[in-house]
């Protein structure tokens, strides 16, 4: 009996060592973060959250703070691109071309937050037309500078990013963006904010107001979150669950 148990132990140890030797490589994720600007609170907290989240995942982050390093070769190593409030300008033509190819041809997935939709003419830069089309043909119009609470309602409850989330939830003190037109006609809207739920109330409204959407015309998996102004969002269990779900969906093979 002792010899049998010893044999079983040696066999299990051997299998464990082989599993370790042939462990799956980590999934590489590029995080383009806007640092030191008005959204620093959100970005800094997001980076800390990603670090903590990675303790139970198999991700390897490449964190960059400008678009200078973005090339087709650089992106080829990364399965997911997270745009943490970095705006769609201050990109070189080479970086733009590489990113467009990455999204158009499904070479990776994309998650964008808030400031990633600052589309228009800013800081002397022309609008990136491709990026505007990517997000539904929109142009930035206004925002709720006073920041207000808003109730977010899920529209596509079957989408994996909403797994184990309630049908609606409140996000506090957000700087809700408005655009020159509704992206709904050119994208698949996943959730909206009820402007009548704003506390305190504000006159800056869109009417039908999408806040999470995806562009199914692109081969890459992609999700845009309109919110993401301040670090306090990470105190919301619904928001952190949503972020985690979106990462997991993005890196999962179709």
Each language-model region and where it sits:
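Extracytoplasmic/secreted proteins, especially bacterial periplasmic and envelope-associated proteins
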Residues: 45, 49, 94, 98, ...
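Bacterial Sec-dependent N-terminal signal peptides
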Residues: 1-26
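Extracellular ligand-binding/catalytic regions of CAZymes and related secreted enzymes
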Residues: 24-27, 55-56, 65, 76, ...
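Catalytic beta-strand/loop cores that center a nucleophilic Ser/Cys/Thr
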Residues: 143-218
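Helical hinge/lid and interdomain linker segments adjacent to catalytic or ligand-binding clefts
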Residues: 30-119
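Proline-centered loop/turn at the N-terminus of a beta-strand
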Residues: 28, 109-111, 188, 221
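Short, solvent-exposed loop/turn segments at secondary-structure junctions
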Residues: 36-37, 88, 117-118, 167, ...
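A glycine-rich, often tryptophan-bearing local segment used as a flexible ligand/cofactor-contacting loop or short
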Residues: 90-164
């Amino acid at each position: 009996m002792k010899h049998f148990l010893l044999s079983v132990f040696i066999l299990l140890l051997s299998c464990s060592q082989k599993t370790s030797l042939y462990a799956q490589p980590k999934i590489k994720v590029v995080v383009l973060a806007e640092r030191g600007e008005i959204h620093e609170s959100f970005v800094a907290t997001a980076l800390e959250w990603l670090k903590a989240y990675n303790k139970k995942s198999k991700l390897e982050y490449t964190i960059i703070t400008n678009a200078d390093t973005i090339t087709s070769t650089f992106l080829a190593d990364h399965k997911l691109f997270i745009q943490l409030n970095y705006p769609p300008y201050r990109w070189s033509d080479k970086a733009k071309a590489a990113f467009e190819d990455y999204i158009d041809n499904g070479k990776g997935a994309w998650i964008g937050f808030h400031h990633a939709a600052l589309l228009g003419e800013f800081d002397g830069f022309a609008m990136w037309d491709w990026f505007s089309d990517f997000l539904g043909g929109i142009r930035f119009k206004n925002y709720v500078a006073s920041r207000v609470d808003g109730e977010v309602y899920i529209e596509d409850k079957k989408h994996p990013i909403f797994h184990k989330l309630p049908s609606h939830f409140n996000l506090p003190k957000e700087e809700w963006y408005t655009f020159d037109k509704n992206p709904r006609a050119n994208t698949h809207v996943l959730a909206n904010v009820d402007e009548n739920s704003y506390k305190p109330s504000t006159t800056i409204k869109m009417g039908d107001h999408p806040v999470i959407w995806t562009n199914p015309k692109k081969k890459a998996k992609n999700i845009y979150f309109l919110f993401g102004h301040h670090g306090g969002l990470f105190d919301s269990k619904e928001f952190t669950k949503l972020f985690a779900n979106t990462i997991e969906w993005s890196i999962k093979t179709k």
